[in-house]
Swiss-Prot record:
Biological processes, Gene Ontology terms: prolyl-tRNA aminoacylation
Designated name of the protein: Proline--tRNA ligase 2
InterPro entries hit by this protein: aa-tRNA-synt_IIb, aa-tRNA-synth_II, aa-tRNA-synth_II/BPL/LPL, Anticodon-bd, Anticodon-bd_dom_sf, Pro-tRNA-ligase_IIa, Pro-tRNA-ligase_IIa_arc-type, Pro-tRNA_ligase_II_C
Subunit annotation: Homodimer.
Role summary: Catalyzes the attachment of proline to tRNA(Pro) in a two-step reaction: proline is first activated by ATP to form Pro-AMP and then transferred to the acceptor end of tRNA(Pro).
Alphabetical list of PROSITE patterns matching this protein: AA_TRNA_LIGASE_II
Subcellular location(s) per record: Cytoplasm
UniProt GO cellular component terms: aminoacyl-tRNA synthetase multienzyme complex; cytoplasm
Amino acid sequence: MAKEQVQAITKMEEDFAQWYTDIVKKAELVDYSSVKGCMILRPYGYALWENMQKVMDEKLKATSHENVYMPMFIPESLLQKEKDHVEGFAPEVAWVTHGGDEKLAERLCVRPTSETLFCEHFSKIVQSYNDLPKLYNQWCSVVRWEKTTRPFLRTTEFLWQEGHTIHETAEESQAETLNILNLYASFCEDYLAIPVIKGQKTEKEKFAGAKATYTIESLMHDGKALQTGTSHNFGTNFSEAFDIKFLDRNGKWQYVHQTSWGVSTRMIGGLIMVHSDNNGLVMPPKVAPVQVVIVPIAQHKEGVLAKATELQGHIQKVARVKIDASNKTPGWKFNEYEMKGIPIRLEVGPKDIEKNQVVLVRRDTKEKEFISMDQLEERIPALLEEIHNSLFNKAKVFRDENTYSVTSFEEMKKVADEKQGFIKAMWCGELACEEKLKEEVGVSSRCMPFEQEHLAEECVCCGKEAKQMVYWGKAY
């Protein structure tokens, strides 16, 4: 059965989209529901999200952010208060029109995001500069009625965290925006082993209603970019629309400066597409629901299960570990846990017990070694760290090898047609050039990176004076 499972995974080189779908299903991360675009997060998938959520929640609380919960429903009149915001989300909004058989006096939007609710609340609770800042975070689900859906990457309903903060000064809100972006970047790199590029979105790509949007971008196995997280500086755009004022230190009324930021289960999609292979999922150790699986060999023989249980007791002091004592064959179990991407597999049988050793197999490299049972508590944490670093470095090498610098429109078109990955090119800052590159080359601007390079004097599209270097690419 397990071999059939492995064979059923489409090779990523043949059909990347199907390879991805096969993995999320066969690794038992999700199942499809009866509503298009709504996924069922199975225990293994939800445990992964819980581990990610736990780390992020601790980091946010350590920086004085507080968790709150806003309602799921937004009155239509409230949603329409910020013009750019409502226009940006209008095509994706799901509406509630009836309560039972009774038609509602006003339509209710099922939240696509909660800016308007936070703004309404802030306008009621802020009076003076003494009430600032307010640093709020919410864990919830949101609904966006997507036309094309794929598990984790683009779903009608998804889980996320959304942060909303208000500040006394423009400097404070800008610092918050960038601090959160850095928090997201370190989470991706230090926990998910996904290298990111930090930068600012163009006017065309920024969040509806924002003064500026900052992003972390990652490169997937198929050469497409994934926007892994965003942080927005609203300036006073929303506070003016919602009349969120405070008395400043000079006794004058001022509008608050505001931020918004979020990451979602989309990160799980990124994790899959950066690390996994044609044998299944590859889990970054720090967020893996199970870090070590023990497979007893000839478990019916006396002492084998007892020894496996003893080892579990030692290992659980340093890692998340499970024993598979089911009646399935060892071969089935090997394939099953390879499919699920568990970082380390330990095999222990009668001969191993005689030699006081176990067989240790790494999921990421398939490397096998014999290790003394007495060394496991020390070896496993070090190996998990080694696996994390190996996954990160491998992903970074892949990204760097698939990043191309171009200086002309023709060169850019040729690279976009023949290669897959990021394209670095200079840009004049004009919307017309950005749209032309989208239409004629098939790439969108991913970000204006903080780490700028001067590749040429002229814009890659129009030849006019360039203002900055931009990462371009095909994207999810």
